[in-house]
Amino acid sequence: MDVGSDFMAGIVVKPRARILHGHDWVFSSEVLKVFGKPADGDVISLKDGRDRLIGSAIYNSKSQIIARRFSRQRQDLDLDFFKRRIAQAAEYRSRRHVDPKLCRVVWSESDGLPGVIIDRYGDHFVLQTLTLAMDLRKDLIANAIVDLFCGASASLAKGEVEAGGAPALQSIVERNDAPIRRAEGLELKSGILRGDASVETEFQIAGVRFAIDLLHGQKTGFYLDQKTNYQIVAEHAAGRRVLDCFADEGAFALTCARAGAADVAAVEENSENIAAGKHNAERNGLKVRWIEQDVFAFLRAAEKAEAQYDLIILDPPSFTKTKSGLRDALRGYRELHLRAFKLLSKDGLLATFSCSHHVSEAAFAQTIADALVDARRSARKLRRFEQALDHPVLPTIPETEYFKGILLEMMPGR
């Protein structure tokens, strides 16, 4: 595989290919012809039907997305390029006042690095390479991270080198165990790419100290796309009976308990997640009732028991990864919200979220409205939730906007 492509190989796209309308992907069905015999993982040229260059892309014939553009110019994937793109991503987050030591530093196409995810937790970095071309170059990417955040060029972001000259990087953890890698023909694996093998780290959100295992914990360590929402929801928790559904490791439950909730119950069916949540509850001196059970089963049982809550949080995993599963996903959301509405007190609050890209914000809102009708309840919409600013949305790539959420207040006497 020619990592240093001479750009002789490439693809000519069909006239109506989405890449001609601002997207950065080329699907196999959008290819007019392939020229120059590119190898999987190569950098290739993209051209339109008039032989005009429309950019440089990474190539994988085994993927449904056969090419992913990373530049509109002729550009190879070398160390200088990775350093430049990562620096640009870090500078964007700095302008948006994102905490530089607790953020997603790079988010794939949103930062011009298709398939690359870099998260930062203090002095530890977590790297995912979800496309073949980027996986072949993960050592280059790791070197770029070291150069930017630990080497002579660490002045890129002010304060990255600690007092006394200590480096601002202890480890780079590889978390390439995401199933989506299989779509690129890649194996699943995780390990240490650079630095200290001790990768438990600690950080604070909404007054709660979280300790996470970057090598063995969920995904890349934490749900950073919800980082600001934990604080927002917790601001409504004081004095309320809180139910956190699909609690995972209990970030909502713990921040609500820290904010003064009268009672907090966290429902999660994964015992390892509950163990991690209990560990963080104990180290913060917080009281949470952990319930290891399927959420739908719990909600049905709670309704029979005539339980009531003043704040319910619904933060389920994606209900569908494909467009074909949309109908079933909407049915699931409708039932989930119906069950929740039946448990809310007369002026209770519901914070509900969806991370399913194929479920549009309009469709999500409609399922909530339908569930309100079914439950014979009325509610006011207090606010929308969005993915955090370190997960940028590109209007020309709809797939970058996957997250939506709503905060509702029930209306008494209706």
Predicted regions: what they are:
Residues 273, 309-339:
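Mobile active-site "lid"/loop adjacent to the S-adenosyl-L-methionine
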Residues 249-261:
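Conserved SAM-binding loop of SAM-dependent methyltransferases across substrates and taxa
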Residues 308, 335, 349-414:
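C-terminal catalytic and target-recognition region of SAM-dependent MTase-like enzymes
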Residues 1-122, 150-151:
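Non-catalytic accessory regions of SAM-dependent methyltransferases
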Residues 263-268:
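Conserved SAM-binding motif I beta-strand of class I
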Residues 239-246:
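Conserved class I S-adenosyl-L-methionine
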Residues 106-119, 135-150, 165-222:
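Non-catalytic substrate-recognition/targeting regions of SAM-dependent transferases
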